[in-house]
Amino acid sequence: MGSLPVRIKRLRATPLPAYMTEHAAGVDLCASLSADFVLAPGERALVPTGLAIELPPGFEAQVRPRSGLALRHGIALVNSPGTIDADYRGEIGVILINLGSEPFTVSDGERIAQMVFARCERAEFIEVDELGDTARGAGGFGHTGR
């Protein structure tokens, strides 16, 4: 597995992201809070991480939910995956939502999401009058599962 140089800046005292196992695809992001807060069922909040990154051109970072929080507490990300573009230099924030039935306390330093790095290509759009035919055609949602 190769490595990607990513410049990172701590905006507050917060743990640096780390891979938790040898072959983990993502690093954990932690909440960087001055005080814990409660996320009520159905409520969402932007949770700061205290981190900013500089990605090389041609890469993005994807912010994804943690499966354990989803399974045990119904905690998810509203926009999953969230995209961090290579030219973004602000603080990484995570939009959490409580889809569970119980209030959930978000604590400072708690692992709230994971971040995965990926190459990305820029599309060059070529406007045409017709698109090529396929067996699927315009079959949409649920089409391949019938």
Swiss-Prot record:
Q: Which residues does the record give as substrate binding sites?
A: R66, S67, G68, N79, T83, I84, D85
The protein's annotated pathway = Pyrimidine metabolism; dUMP biosynthesis; dUMP from dCTP (dUTP route): step 2/2
Pfam families listed in its UniProt record: dUTPase
Cite a single GO MF annotation: magnesium ion binding
Q: Which GO terms describe its biological process?
A: dUMP biosynthetic process; dUTP catabolic process
Q: Which InterPro entries does the entry link to?
A: dUTPase, dUTPase-like, dUTPase-like_sf, dUTPase_trimeric
Q: Which residues cross the membrane?
A: none
What's the catalysed reaction? Answer: dUTP + H2O = dUMP + diphosphate + H(+)
- Domain of life of the organism in this record? Bacteria
Name the Enzyme Commission number(s) assigned to this protein.
3.6.1.23
Q: What does this protein need as cofactor?
A: Mg(2+)
Q: Any idea which UniProt keywords this protein has?
A: Hydrolase, Magnesium, Metal-binding, Nucleotide metabolism
| Described function | This enzyme is involved in nucleotide metabolism: it produces dUMP, the immediate precursor of thymidine nucleotides and it decreases the intracellular concentration of dUTP so that uracil cannot be incorporated into DNA.
Q: Which family does it belong to?
A: Belongs to the dUTPase family.
Q: State the protein's name.
A: Deoxyuridine 5'-triphosphate nucleotidohydrolase
Q: Which organism is it from?
A: Citrifermentans bemidjiense (strain ATCC BAA-1014 / DSM 16622 / JCM 12645 / Bem) (Geobacter bemidjiensis)
Its ancestry begins with: Bacteria, Pseudomonadati, Thermodesulfobacteriota, Desulfuromonadia, Geobacterales
Gene name of the record = dut
